[in-house]
Amino acid sequence: MTSDVLQLTCDLIARASVTPADAGCQALIADRLSAAGFACEHLRLGAVDNLWATHGSGAPVLVLLGHTDVVPPGPASDWASDPFAPQVRDGVLYGRGAADMKGSVAAFVVAAEQFVAAHPEHPGTLAVLLTSDEEGDAIDGVRHVARLFAERGQQIDWCITGEPSSTERLGDLLRVGRRGSLSGNLIVKGVQGHVAYPHKARNPIHLAAPALAELIARQWDDGFESFPPTSLQISNIHAGTGANNVIPGELQVAFNLRYTPHWNAETLEREIVALLERHALTYTLAWHRSGEPFYTPEGTLRRVAREVLGAFVGAPPEESTGGGTSDARFIAPLGAQCIEVGPVNASIHQVDEHVRVADLEALPALYRTLVERLLV
C-alpha cells in the first residue's frame, strides 16, 4: 500500500514544473490544505506562482518554506526512467524533484494536516509558503513575497526550509545559515592591434592580470562562527577573436563571491571597485546580488531542531552554513530565525535524482515533531 506522502510526492513529480512553471502543484496542495482548515492565498506575479497558507492566528508564527519548481532534467534518454514519471525501484523513488524538493513539500503538507487534526486550537500560526521561482531567477518568488510581507507588517518568528540538507542519512545535518552570493561581470577595455606591433595596442589581458591576481590572492576574512571564509572564484574569462595574431580589444571576466556576515554586498562592491581603480583600468562592471548571508544563532529554533534531529538520528547533527543559496535568505531579514532540514542531497540536480522511500516516509513525523515542539 502506497503511503500518503509517497503518493503525494509522486503526484507532484508527475507535474513537470520546470522553473518558473508550477504546473498545478500549488493548486493540488492548496486543495488539501484548504480541506484541512488552512486559509490559502495565491500570490502570483508574472509567470511565478506563490502560495501562502495559514492555520491559527497570532504569534508565534512558524513557516514551512519550500518550492514547487525543479531544474530542467536534460535529455530524458539519459535517465533510467522518465524524469516526470515517478518510479520506485528497490526502495528508492526516482524522478525530477524527488529530493529537491517535492518530497519535502509533500512531507510538509502531510505533517501540517496531521498537526492541525491533532491540535485544531493550537497556539500561534502555522504557515506554508511555496514558490515556483527558487531554481530560476528568484525574483518574483519568495523575494517578492518577503517585500509584500514587509509592507503588511507580517511577523515571522521561525522558518523551516525543506531544502535537501542531509549528507549521508536523513537528519545528519542541520543548516543554520547560508553565505551571501554576489556576482560580477567585468569588462576591461584595451585597444585591439596586431601582435607584432604591441606598442600600437593595449592588451586588456595584460592590463587586468595584476588586478585579477590580487583579487584571487586576497584573504577576505577568516570565516565567521559556522561559516567558512569568504571566497572569490572566477568562473569565466573571454577575450580575443580566436585568431592568434590579434591583440584583443577587451577582456570579459565573470566572478562570484560567497561571503560571510562580516560583509554585505555594498561593502564588497566598494572594495573591488577600489582595487580596480588602484590598477588604473578602463572598465565597466555590472553586479548581481543574489542574497545577503543569514545566520541563526543559538536560540529556541536551533535548540529544538538539534534535539529533534539528535533523537531521530541517534547522534547530534552537524550544524553547518555550507552549500549554495536558498529562499531562507529572503525570510531571515524579516527577523525570523531560519533553519534548513531535508532529505539527502547526493542526487540533486542530477540525472536519476532520487530519494529513499524510507526517508521520505519518515519526513512527515520529523516535521510534525518540530512543529509540535515549537507551537504546542
UniProtKB/Swiss-Prot annotation:
Keyword tags: Amino-acid biosynthesis, Cobalt, Diaminopimelate biosynthesis, Hydrolase, Lysine biosynthesis, Metal-binding, Zinc
UniProt remark on cofactor binding: Binds 2 Zn(2+) or Co(2+) ions per subunit.
Metabolic or biological pathway, per its Swiss-Prot or TrEMBL entry: Amino-acid biosynthesis; L-lysine biosynthesis via DAP pathway; LL-2,6-diaminopimelate from (S)-tetrahydrodipicolinate (succinylase route): step 3/3
UniProt xrefs under CDD domains: M20_DapE_proteobac (cd03891)
Record flagged with keyword Disulfide bond: no
Alphabetized Pfam families for the sequence: M20_dimer (PF07687), Peptidase_M20 (PF01546)
Domain of life of the organism encoding this protein: Bacteria
A single GO molecular function term of this UniProt record: cobalt ion binding
Family in the record: Belongs to the peptidase M20A family. DapE subfamily.
Name by which UniProt lists this protein: Succinyl-diaminopimelate desuccinylase
Listed EC numbers: 3.5.1.18
Ligand binding (Zn(2+) 1): 67, 100, 163
Gene: dapE
Any one GO BP annotation for this protein: lysine biosynthetic process via diaminopimelate
The keyword Ion transport is assigned to this record: no
Species the sequence originates in: Xanthomonas campestris pv. campestris (strain 8004)
Cofactors demanded by this protein: Zn(2+); Co(2+)
Function: Catalyzes the hydrolysis of N-succinyl-L,L-diaminopimelic acid (SDAP), forming succinate and LL-2,6-diaminopimelate (DAP), an intermediate involved in the bacterial biosynthesis of lysine and meso-diaminopimelic acid, an essential component of bacterial cell walls.
Binding sites annotated in the UniProt record for Zn(2+) 2: 100, 135, 349
